[in-house]
Amino acid sequence: MNRLHRQKMPWRAPVMVAAQLAALYGEEGLIWLDGDGSALGRWVTLGVTPVETVCCRGRPGEPGASNPFEALRHLEEGHWTGWLSYEAAAWSEPGNAWCADAMPSLWIARHDPILRFDLQNQHLWIEGTNPNSITAMLDSLATAPTALSTNPHPIALDAWTHHTDRSGFANGVR
């Protein structure tokens, strides 16, 4: 079992740190689990450059299909973020007629280290199992620009990949 290391950092708003991470490491692999500062939304988690990803697609009996629940049973320790779709139930309810889905039934990534923000008390920590990775991220953040661009780029909707069309999505929701 890897020991979790946690180090307090000076408080900075999550949006500032996310901008730094994106500038340092790129946007691909950047995760932001947001909160609103309420009792249920106290925490924000940021991570970048996943050290591992797991993706399962397909239904039982299909060529190349992989069981998402079996994948979950064999995860290494760490901070995992992602999703398990409703269609993953095809592996536990094989008698039901499950529709094929272009989206993975499981997609998760492990980030080490992560940054944890307590919005209520304005505390910030870096957490991870690899002290060298923690030090490297701290060093990178210490030298990265801290100002947000005054002219931020809009969300590049044309760069998004749509895995289903509008009709396929609507049918999958039904």
What residue ranges belong to the model's regions?
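Signature of the chorismate-utilizing enzyme
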Residues: 1-174
